[in-house]
Amino acid sequence: PLKDLLSLRKEAEDALDSAFPQAEVDKTGSKSISIEGGSLTRKVDVVPSNWYNTNKYAETGSDIYRGVQILDKSVPTRLANTPFLHNAWIDHKDVNTGGGMRKACRLMKSLKYDSENIDLSSYDIVSIAFNIPDASLTYPQGGELLILSACLDYCRQLQMNSALRESIEVPDKHRKIFCDGHATLLGLNQLTQELEQLANDVLRENQRSFRRL
C-alpha cells in the first residue's frame, strides 16, 4: 500500500542519516533520496519502491517483465516502471551495435557527471542514446570517436526537429522521453553544448598532432 511506501521512505531517510553522518543526505527529491560526500566517492540515489507484477509477467513468468512501483511523495502516488525490460532492450541494442550503445551511454553520462550543468536524468540520457540509429553507433575497430559524432549529430537533430523530439520513447515504451516532469529542451541544449565542446577539444588535439608530424 501507498502508506507503507511512505513509511519506508521515512525509515530510509533516517537510516541514511545515521549510517552516513559525514555525508549530505538530500531528502527533497520526490522520487529518490540522494546522498553524497563523506566516505562516498560519488552521488548515490536511493529509490523507495515495491514489486509490481505486469500482465506480461503473469503470462510468461519471465523476470524481464516484472515491474516496480516507485513512490512519488509529492503527490503522493506510485509510478509503475519496468527496469528489467529496460535493461533487456539496452542489452539487445548493445549487441546489435557491437558495443556502441553502451559507449554512447557512458560518454554522455560522463559529460553529465563532469559538468554538473546538464539538467537531464541518467535514465533519459540512456533513453536518448537508445534512439540513435544502430548504424550510427556501429563503428569499425579504432573508430571509437565516431560514437561522439553520432551522439552530437543525433542531439542536434532533436534540437531542430520538435516532432522527432516529442515522438521518441524510453526503451520499455512506458512514456515519452521529452514530457512533463522529465527531459526538457533546456537539458538537451546543455548536453549538446557539452558534446560540441568535447568535439572541438578533440579536433584541436588532432590538429596539434598533425602539426607535429
Language-model features, listed with the residues they occupy:
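Terminal (often C-terminal) interaction modules
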Residues: 161-213
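Catalytic cores of NTP-dependent nucleotidyl/adenyl transfer enzymes across multiple folds
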Residues: 2-157, 210-211
